[in-house]
Regions:
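Sec-dependent signal peptide hydrophobic core
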Residues: 7-15
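Hinge/capping helix and adjacent helix->loop/strand transition within the periplasmic-binding protein
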Residues: 85-91, 105-192, 241, 254-287
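C-terminal segment of classical bacterial N-terminal signal peptides
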Residues: 16-26
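N-terminal (or domain-start) structured segment
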Residues: 27-116, 155-157, 163, 179-208, ...
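N-terminal secretory signal peptides that target proteins for export/translocation
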Residues: 1-6
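Short beta-strand->loop
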Residues: 113-123, 181-185, 203-204, 213-251, ...
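An extracytoplasmic/periplasmic, membrane-proximal ligand-sensing/linker region
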Residues: 32-34, 243, 265-329
Length: 329
């Protein structure tokens, strides 16, 4: 009998069992310190406000504080890269919107792979968009807008918040659906664009309801319709663009939560349960509603749902963005 070989095998087996026990113990103990939730945009913006609302409720579920950190730059790719390179221990999480799906096309030299370098946690909330016109812009309804757009084409100016912004994506989809080309006017954000729209220097703006509800309720803009698949409970008289003749038109600002690739399954489950806990929290539901956000149904609050949705969105936007031949790098 080879005693040294037997001892070596026993030690290896003991080490394997020890690693399993250690991993299980880690998952059971998680979290033992604050968890970072990285936001790729400025404090005070819609994604940041949503993240901070979720963080408060997630903290209750996890038993540790979830701290929101803002990491700005390059349309969210700076923050994405930070998370992709972080330790997959569950202490670095990330919330992002449609930009996660457009980055692989807009940036030809991404330092990460959007599909394979992250752990999927959950979809969380959608924010519909609205198509608005200046009070000085002639069309009053969406059918009138469609007719006018096909007559005037590039004489109509359409604002956006820059390449890859959801306002720009909405404008791209709108022009494709209409078969016309508008004159794009880029701004540093939709806030300045709204000021120009209110002043009559702009014709049209597509922006999320978090930004446009005050103007809509104040009747200082013309509302042509909403970009969601169905009418909104808080804007019941606003038709969808689908209803108005733009078949299959839909764009919402969707949000998902991710972690670095390689997170332990048990940790993913704990984080996912914390997200689901938050999405059922009446305070979160109310504050999300105040933003114009719609909590996704439970069936979408899973890692698999987020993974499938991201793939669909990448495939949806890639041909449109490539056809425009505009890149961010």
């Amino acid at each position: 009998m080879n005693v040294s070989k037997t001892i070596r095998s026993a030690l290896l087996a003991a080490g394997f069992v020890s690693s399993l026990v250690s991993g299980a113990a880690h998952a059971q103990a998680y979290p033992t310190k604050p968890v970072s939730l990285i936001v790729p945009f400025a404090a005070g913006g819609p994604t940041d406000v949503l993240a901070r609302t979720l963080a408060v409720s997630m903290s209750k579920s996890l038993g540790q504080t979830v701290v929101v950190e803002n990491r700005l730059g390059a349309g969210g790719t700076v923050a994405s890269n930070v998370v992709a390179k972080a330790a997959p221990d569950g202490y670095t999480l990330f919330i992002h919107h449609n930009g996660m799906a457009t980055a692989p096309t807009l940036y030809r030299k991404l330092p990460f792979n959007a599909l394979t370098d992250f752990t999927y946690i959950s979809l969380v909330a959608d924010v519909p968009m609205t198509l608005l016109g200046s009070k000085k812009f002639p069309p009053n309804t969406m059918p009138e807008f469609i007719k006018y757009a096909k007559q005037q084409g590039d004489k109509i100016n359409l604002a956006n918040a820059g390449l890859g912004a959801v306002s720009q994506l909405c404008g791209t989809l709108l022009q494709q659906a209409l078969g016309v080309g508008f004159t794009a006017i880029p701004f540093s954000g939709t806030g300045p664009a709204m000021v120009a729209l209110l002043g009559g220097q702009l014709d049209v703006l597509c922006d999320q309801t978090t930004q446009t509800l005050p103007q809509i309720k104040g009747n200082t803009v013309k509302l042509y319709g909403v970009t969601s698949a169905e009418r909104l409970s808080y804007l019941p008289d606003a038709p969808t663009l689908r209803e108005s003749g733009l078949k299959d038109f839909e764009i919402v600002v969707w949000h998902g939560i991710y972690g670095p690739k390689g997170m332990a399954p048990d940790v993913v489950t704990k984080v996912n349960k914390a997200v689901q806990y938050a999405l059922k929290d009446p305070d979160v539901i109310q504050k999300a509603g105040d933003l114009g956000a719609v909590i996704v149904p439970v069936t979408k609050q899973t890692p698999a749902a987020l993974q499938a949705w991201l793939k669909l969105e990448i495939d949806k936007w890639a041909p449109l963005l490539k056809a425009a031949n505009q890149y961010a790098d």
